[in-house]
A protein has these predicted regions:
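All-alpha prenyltransferase/terpene-synthase fold signal
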Residues: 99, 262-265, 282
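A hydrophobic, small-residue-rich beta->alpha segment in the mid-to-C-terminal subdomain
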Residues: 245, 255-266
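Conserved alpha-helical "signature site"
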Residues: 1-255, 294-297
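Terminal targeting/low-complexity segments that flank the catalytic cores of oxidoreductases
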Residues: 1-4, 269-297
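Short, surface-exposed acidic
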Residues: 139, 205-207, 264-276
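Generic low-complexity, intrinsically disordered sequence content enriched
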Residues: 240, 257, 262, 277-280
């Protein structure tokens, strides 16, 4: 076994250990349990959320933002549950919790983490917009998938900062993709690391697959449409400058990933996708409420 293969296997074990230690807050687990119980009522869910005032406040903050665009104020958690519905609440609670995970480190780590989340929020908002535009059910799931797609970068920069920084420098110096630099440094890339983490967390298969294959969507099997949506959203965000590591031209659109989609009766094309940039930018701006939550800590 060569050095990089050995490093990859050791890295996977370490990521699995990190996932065990990075458990979601107890309230979030309770919320998920209530939502997944077919006997649960809206009152049951509202009761669990209301028991965590900080989470409840953030849910109301997002529910009353331009992100959802409801015409009247949602003043209570009970009303938020009724108006948003269980599926949207599940995605929202999970997203809010993710934004508050992983902290500390050096100033440059914190700066990079902020850029990471800004890119991820933008990608989530873009994926949600594309899901609505292209007729996919449950656009909130697309937002979560977009938010999570690069979580491998977050983990690598949090726990192996010097190696991660070395990968950034290597990509710049050798003019190679960041994934290539990661593989030379770690023996694995961020998509693999994120996928291992998602599997260890027992996330739904379609979310784990989206993380694994957001750069290689044709490899997806569980939910190829979701993976393709996030792939497209990621490309758009990089093209528009919503980029986590400042290398916007290194990503390549997998054109075959567009084939399952149509818009206004016509098959989706690269020109059509890139022509949505103005609309996508508006949706990204509406998602700034998540940046406020991130900055509030």
């Amino acid at each position: 076994m060569d050095y990089l293969q050995n490093r990859k296997e050791n890295l996977r074990k370490q990521v699995e250990d990190i996932a065990e230690l990075s458990a979601l807050p107890a309230t979030v687990v309770q919320v998920m349990d209530v939502i997944n119980n077919p006997k649960s009522s809206a009152a049951d869910l509202a009761s669990v959320i209301s028991a965590d005032p900080a989470l409840a406040a953030k849910i109301l903050q997002v529910a009353n933002s331009a992100f959802y665009g409801f015409p009247r104020k949602i003043a209570t958690v009970s009303l938020a549950v009724v108006v948003l519905g269980f599926d949207a609440l599940k995605d929202l609670v999970f997203s809010i919790s993710l934004l508050q995970m992983f902290s500390g480190g050096r100033a440059e780590q914190q700066s990079l983490r902020k850029q990471f989340w800004q890119h991820s929020i933008s990608c989530g908002a873009s994926a949600r917009f594309l899901a609505k535009k292209l007729g996919r059910r449950l656009p909130g799931e697309s937002f979560v998938a977009g938010l999570l797609h690069d979580i491998g970068k977050l983990i690598m920069s949090q726990y192996w900062w010097e190696d991660f920084k070395r990968s950034l420098e290597l990509a710049e110096r050798e003019d190679i993709t960041f994934r290539e630099a990661e593989e030379m440094t770690f023996g694995a890339n961020h998509a693999e690391v994120g996928g291992w983490f998602a599997e260890s967390w027992n996330l739904p298969a379609q979310l784990a697959e989206t993380i694994y294959y957001h750069h290689t969507p044709l490899m997806a099997r569980t939910d190829a449409q979701l993976v393709s949506l996030v792939h497209m959203a990621n490309i758009l965000c990089h093209q528009m400058g919503f980029d986590a590591n400042g290398r916007p031209r290194e990503l390549v659109l997998e054109k075959k990933a567009l084939e399952p989609f149509s818009l206004n009766g016509r098959r989706m094309s690269e020109d059509c996708l890139l022509g949505m940039q103005e609309q996508v930018h508006i949706q990204v701006q509406k998602a700034t409420v998540f940046n406020h939550i991130l900055n509030a800590g």
